[in-house]
């Protein structure tokens, strides 16, 4: 595939960039368990701190490499930098959190085969469903780039990919608050603390929406001109940027509600995710390959495939369970945000 889309390029820099990218992707996936370990022991703040530091390091290296005109190799190097920094800091914080490293070294327990098999059977019931959900999410996000490389010019593919990266960075940052509240939500749900569940959930969803709006506005007003200054040929239109941002927003918005369901071990949404991931890719091929709609074909396909079902159905399920509609949830989220801000300044 890489040879196919880069057939007109000279030299081997794109293949070197691809090799570095594959190595970086492997490292990020392989050491991803450290994030779960940190959250599992309660070090949520440390986990989020590591993510911010690693992303900052990636952006700094990316800008520096682009200024040095290293092209795709620079992008790949910045990505592997993110993975290395992430792994080192995850390990650092985990082994120093409440003397975990010291306690592990003093532990003499060696797991036996039967214990491992029993644990695997217990986890597998929901683990394969979560895996299917992760695959569906990856399929939705990454297939757009592949389809664009088949039907769009190299310049358009680059513009689309950059727009996706910027939008993803914004919503990932906005979603961090929700992620940090996951242990609190899980505890409140398991203890049947309905009031606390409503307040925490409303607060995190409201904050996610507000930060996404502010972040997207900042990217459109400030980010685009800065990128154009660094890379003049990278002209991301306002419409495309807003379209890609809206798609990334509804993905995480949907995830707010499905994560709420998974907190009580209900992965009831995995089939819908898989079905509409296939619908998404089918629409992308149809709109780009048959109707030649370019980047807008990708955006429309992605948005429509989620709006058909996932974006409205799972919020409706959760709202019914919480006995509140979206307006009431946002109102409660606003009040909780205001109260927390007041407490911090008192």
Show which residues each predicted segment covers:
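Membrane-interface helix-loop junctions in multi-pass transport and translocation proteins
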Residues: 10, 45, 56-88, 223, ...
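Interhelical loop/hinge segments that connect adjacent transmembrane helices in multipass membrane
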Residues: 72-78, 88-141, 192-196, 320-345
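Membrane-interface junctions at transmembrane-helix termini in multi-pass inner-membrane proteins
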Residues: 25-51, 242-275
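Helix-loop junctions and terminal segments of transmembrane helices
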Residues: 40, 98-102, 163, 167-192, ...
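Interfacial/gating helices of multi-pass transporter permease domains
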Residues: 72-77, 118-126, 130, 147-168, ...
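Interfacial segments at transmembrane-helix termini and the short loops linking adjacent helices
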Residues: 1-20, 154, 194-195, 220-249
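Helix-terminus/linker motif at the lipid-water interface of multi-pass membrane proteins
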Residues: 3-6, 64-69, 131, 138-169, ...
